Curated annotation (Swiss-Prot):
This is LexA repressor. It comes from the Bacteria. The keyword Methyltransferase does not apply. InterPro entries: LexA, LexA-like, LexA/Signal_pep-like_sf, LexA_DNA-bd_dom, LexA_repressor, Peptidase_S24_LexA, Peptidase_S24_S26A/B/C, WH-like_DNA-bd_sf. It catalyses: Hydrolysis of Ala-|-Gly bond in repressor LexA. Represses a number of genes involved in the response to DNA damage (SOS response), including recA and lexA. In the presence of single-stranded DNA, RecA interacts with LexA causing an autocatalytic cleavage which disrupts the DNA-binding part of LexA, leading to derepression of the SOS regulon and eventually DNA repair. It is an enzyme of class 3 (hydrolase). It comes from Vibrio vulnificus (strain YJ016). Belongs to the peptidase S24 family. GO terms for molecular function: DNA binding; serine-type endopeptidase activity. The keyword Nucleotide-binding does not apply.
Length: 207
């Protein structure tokens, strides 16, 4: 990682602080106000510089579309696959505070290779064998096709569903008739694909 300038470090520290305190990243206007910039455009230029240095990711079309990347790198420093529990709003899915532990399982046993495990909550995908408490092996990618089971972030909620794109609308289908599809209007809602499901580990097999 390239070193940050003092001003960039101030912006980065403010983003981290806002996420820790409020659960959400700041808007450009909030950054400008708190750090004394003349306009939100000045804040945007600093954010672009941080993105070029790969410490944050800017999510297009969202006023609070800022994601910190450094924690994701730190989560991958330990051997094994990181197990992700609950995910806080506005934070990277691989942020250190989300990692419950690392499982000593070979990522290459999955195709494509798994990058992390996600603890499944609920029974919305039980009809295809994804049960409450299972560990879902996930390959981190945003390159997905219709019909794939994905880990998606809708606004601030993370969910596991089957993807269907219809123009500017995305339907996230459950595999349980008791659950209605989640409909996402991409013109007004933020959708981030965190990865695709590549396998299941029954939690009881590893505890």
């Amino acid at each position: 990682m390239k070193p940050l300038t003092p001003r960039q470090q101030q912006v980065f520290d403010l983003i981290k602080s806002k996420i820790e305190v409020t659960g959400m990243p700041p808007t450009r206007a909030e950054i400008a106000r708190e750090l004394g910039f003349r306009s939100a455009n000045a804040a945007e230029e600093h954010l672009k510089a941080l993105a070029r240095k790969q410490v944050i990711e800017i999510v297009p079309g969202a006023s609070r579309g800022i994601r910190i990347l450094l924690e994701e790198e730190a989560a991958n420093d330990e051997p094994g696959l990181p197990l992700i529990g609950r995910v806080a709003a506005g934070e990277p899915i691989l942020a250190q505070e989300h990692v419950e532990m690392h499982y000593q399982v070979d990522p290459s046993m999955f195709r494509p290779q798994a990058d992390f495990l996600l603890r499944v909550h609920g029974e919305s995908m039980k009809d295809i064998g994804i049960m409450d408490g299972d560990l879902l092996a996930v390959h981190k990618t945003q390159d997905v096709r219709n019909g794939q089971v994905v880990v998606a972030r809708v606004e601030d909620d993370v969910t596991v569903k089957r993807l269907e794109r219809k123009g500017s609308t995305v339907l996230l289908h459950a595999e349980n008739e008791e659950f209605a599809p989640i409909e996402v209007d991409l013109t007004s809602q933020q959708l981030t694909i965190e990865g695709i499901a590549v396998g299941i580990i029954r939690n009881t097999d590893w505890m």
